[in-house]
C-alpha cells in the first residue's frame, strides 16, 4: 500500500513538472512562506520551456494524464462554477471519461463471482465486446434466457485501493491549501473533496444505482415525458447491474431527430418540465443528465419521450429547500430582490446576522443586467450561479443539494436551447411553479402536514430526553488519526530523496537541498 502511494506521488510530481502546474499555483495569492518554500523544488532551478497553453488547458491535460479518478474529480470541479474562474471551469467541462475497456475474462469472472453461476447459465447470449467503457464501469450487451435484451454493467476491478490512494493525496492537497490561504479556505477545498469521495463511492455501488433507477421509473410510470429502463433485480449485485436495453436516438443527434420529424420545441419544453417535476413534485432528481445519458424514443416523434440511463447520482431537496427555492425563483423574475435576500436569511443559507439591505443591493447589482435581455435569452442556471456567487461573499454555507440542482439545471437548459434555440425557460417553468405553490397552501396539503406532525407527538418526550442527554454528555477529545498522517510522512520522504539528489548535483546550490532534507525529516518524524 505504501509502495503504491510512493509510486503515485512520483507520478503526480512528474505530471506537475510536465504541465508546469507549480507556475499555475504561484499565480494564486499564496503567503510569503509558501511562495519561498516553492523555490526548494529541484525542477524550479532547471531551465524550462514555457508551454503555449492556457492555464485551464494545462490543468485539464494534467488531470487526463493522472487517470480516471482525477478526471472524474475535474468533472466534479467543472460543475462548481460558483468557485472556479470561467476559463478553468470551461476547460474542465471538456474532460472525457473514456478509458480502454478491461479484458472480457475479468468482466466474466466478476459477473460469475457476484451472481454465483456461469455466464452461460445466466444469459442466452453475452457479448464479450463492451458497448461502452468508462472509469468506473463498462457495459456489455446480453440476452436473458426468457428472450429480453439487456445490458450488463460491471464495475472495473481493483478500483477501491486506487481511489483511496488518490483521495488521500487530494485530501492532503486540500488541507494544505486551506491552511496556506484565506482565499482557499473560502473555497472549502476539503469539503469539495469530501463531496467527491461520497459521489465516487456511491457510483461504485450498483445496487444503489439500481434502486435509484427503480424509484425514478416508478415516479414516471405511464408518463409520456420520461422512460426509465427496467431493472432485473434478481441479477443485480453491488458490482453487477442488469437492466433492460433501450433503443433510442442520442439527444445530441439533431440530424436524426429532424429526419424522423421530431417536434423539437415540445421536446425542449418537456426537458424543462421533467426537471421541475423531479425537483418539486418528487424531490428526487437525476443529477447526471449530461447528453451521454439521455436518449429520445423513436416511437412517437410528434409527442417525443425522453429515455434516461445511468442513475448513479441522484439529488433530493427537503420540503423547506423546495419551498425556499420556488419562492426565490418567482421573486427573482418579479425582480423582488429584497424578498430573495430575506428568503436566503430565513432559510439559513446565509448567516442570520447578514444585513438585508447590503445583500439586496449586491443581488440587484448582479441580476439587473441579466433582466435587460429578452426572457428567452435569460439562463436560469446562470441566474442561480450568479446568486450563489453573490451569496458566497456573504458567507453562504455550501449546500451540496443546491450545487447538484444548479449543475442539472445548466445541463437541461443547455440541452433545451440546443434542441430549440428560442426556448423560453421561464414561460415553461412559471405555470408549474405557481401551480406547485398553490398546492402547497391547499387544504389537502395542510391536512397531510397535520397528520405527519400528529404522528410525531408520541415521540416528543423521547426526543427531548435524548437531546438533554447529549447536552449533559461531554464530548471526548478528538485524537489525530494516524491514517491521516501517512501522506505527510510520505511527502517528507519524497522531500528527503529530492533534497539528497539536489545536494549531489554539482551545478546547483546546496542550501535548498539541506532545507528540503530538514523539512522532510520534520514531516517524517512529527507526531
From Swiss-Prot:
Q: What does this protein do?
A: Is probably a protein kinase regulator of UbiI activity which is involved in aerobic coenzyme Q (ubiquinone) biosynthesis.
Its protein name is: Probable protein kinase UbiB
NCBIfam families referenced in this protein's UniProt entry, alphabetically: PRK04750.1 (NF003404), UbiB (TIGR01982)
Instruction: Tell me what topology the record assigns in the membrane.
Output: Multi-pass membrane protein
* TM stretches of this protein: 23-43, 504-524
Q: Where in the cell is it found?
A: Cell inner membrane
For this protein, the Enzyme Commission number is 2.7.-.-
User: Where is ATP bound in this sequence?
Assistant: 131-139, 153
User: Does Cell membrane appear among the keywords?
Assistant: yes
Associated pathway:
Cofactor biosynthesis; ubiquinone biosynthesis [regulation]
Question: Its family?
Answer: Belongs to the ABC1 family. UbiB subfamily.
Residues of the active site are: 288
Q: Give a GO biological-process term.
A: ubiquinone biosynthetic process
Protein kinase domain boundaries: 125-488
- Coiled-coil regions in this chain? none
One Gene Ontology cellular component = plasma membrane
Output the InterPro entries linked to this UniProt entry. Answer: ABC1_dom, Kinase-like_dom_sf, UbiB, UbiB_bact, UbiB_kinase
The source organism is Ectopseudomonas mendocina (strain ymp) (Pseudomonas mendocina)
UniProt-recorded Gene Ontology molecular function terms: ATP binding; protein kinase activity
Keyword terms, alphabetized: ATP-binding, Cell inner membrane, Cell membrane, Kinase, Membrane, Nucleotide-binding, Transferase, Transmembrane, Transmembrane helix, Ubiquinone biosynthesis
Amino acid at each position: 500500500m505504501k509502495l503504491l502511494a510512493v509510486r503515485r506521488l512520483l507520478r503526480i510530481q512528474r505530471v506537475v513538472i510536465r504541465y508546469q502546474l507549480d507556475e499555475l499555483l504561484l499565480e494564486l495569492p499564496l503567503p510569503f512562506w509558501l511562495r519561498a518554500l516553492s523555490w526548494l523544488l529541484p525542477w524550479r532551478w532547471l531551465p524550462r520551456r514555457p508551454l503555449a497553453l492556457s492555464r485551464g488547458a494545462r490543468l485539464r491535460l494534467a488531470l487526463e494524464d493522472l487517470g480516471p479518478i482525477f478526471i472524474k474529480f475535474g468533472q466534479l470541479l467543472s460543475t462548481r462554477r460558483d468557485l472556479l474562474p470561467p476559463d478553468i471551469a470551461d476547460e474542465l467541462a471538456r474532460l472525457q471519461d473514456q478509458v480502454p475497456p478491461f479484458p472480457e475474462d475479468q468482466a466474466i469472472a466478476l459477473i460469475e463471482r457476484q451472481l454465483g453461476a456461469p455466464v452461460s447459465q445466466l444469459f442466452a447470449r453475452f457479448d464479450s465486446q463492451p458497448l461502452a467503457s468508462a472509469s468506473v464501469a463498462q457495459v456489455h450487451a446480453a440476452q436473458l434466457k426468457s428472450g429480453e435484451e439487456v445490458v450488463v454493467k460491471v464495475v472495473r476491478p481493483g478500483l477501491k485501493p486506487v481511489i483511496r490512494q488518490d483521495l488521500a493525496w487530494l485530501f492532503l492537497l486540500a488541507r494544505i491549501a486551506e491552511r496556506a490561504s484565506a482565499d482557499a479556505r473560502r473555497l472549502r477545498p476539503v469539503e469539495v473533496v469530501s463531496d467527491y469521495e461520497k459521489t465516487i463511492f456511491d457510483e461504485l455501488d450498483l445496487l444503489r444505482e439500481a434502486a435509484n433507477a427503480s424509484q425514478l421509473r416508478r415516479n414516471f410510470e405511464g408518463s409520456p415525458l420520461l422512460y426509465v429502463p427496467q431493472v432485473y433485480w434478481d441479477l443485480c449485485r453491488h458490482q453487477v447491474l442488469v437492466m433492460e436495453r433501450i433503443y433510442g436516438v442520442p439527444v445530441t443527434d439533431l440530424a436524426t431527430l429532424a429526419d424522423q420529424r421530431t417536434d423539437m420545441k415540445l421536446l425542449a419544453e418537456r426537458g424543462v418540465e421533467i426537471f421541475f417535476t423531479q425537483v418539486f413534485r418528487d424531490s428526487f432528481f437525476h443529477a447526471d443528465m449530461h447528453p451521454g445519458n439521455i436518449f429520445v424514443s423513436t416511437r412517437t416523434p410528434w409527442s417525443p419521450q425522453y429515455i434516461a440511463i445511468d442513475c448513479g447520482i441522484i439529488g433530493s431537496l427537503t420540503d423547506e429547500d423546495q419551498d425556499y427555492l420556488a419562492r426565490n425563483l418567482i421573486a427573482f423574475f418579479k425582480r423582488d430582490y429584497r424578498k430573495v435576500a430575506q428568503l436566503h436569511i430565513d432559510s439559513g443559507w446565509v448567516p442570520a446576522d447578514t444585513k438585508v439591505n447590503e445583500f439586496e443591493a449586491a443581488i440587484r447589482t448582479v441580476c439587473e443586467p441579466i433582466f435587460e435581455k429578452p426572457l428567452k435569452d435569460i439562463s436560469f442556471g446562470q441566474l442561480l450561479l450568479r446568486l450563489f456567487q453573490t451569496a458566497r461573499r456573504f458567507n453562504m454555507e455550501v449546500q451540496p443539494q443546491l450545487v447538484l440542482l444548479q449543475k442539472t439545471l445548466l445541463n437541461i437548459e443547455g440541452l433545451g436551447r440546443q434542441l430549440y434555440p428560442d426556448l423560453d425557460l421561464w414561460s415553461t417553468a412559471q405555470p408549474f411553479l405557481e401551480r406547485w405553490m398553490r398546492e402547497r397552501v391547499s387544504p389537502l396539503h395542510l391536512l397531510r402536514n397535520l397528520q405527519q406532525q400528529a404522528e410525531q407527538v408520541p415521540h416528543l418526550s423521547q426526543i427531548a430526553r435524548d437531546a438533554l442527554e447529549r447536552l449533559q454528555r461531554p464530548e471526548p477529545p478528538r485524537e489525530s488519526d494516524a491514517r491521516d498522517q501517512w501522506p505527510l510522512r510520505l511527502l517528507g520522504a519524497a522531500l528527503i530523496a529530492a533534497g539528497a539528489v539536489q545536494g549531489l548535483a554539482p551545478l546547483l546550490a546546496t542550501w535548498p537541498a539541506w532545507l528540503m532534507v530538514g523539512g522532510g525529516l520534520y514531516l517524517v518524524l512529527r507526531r
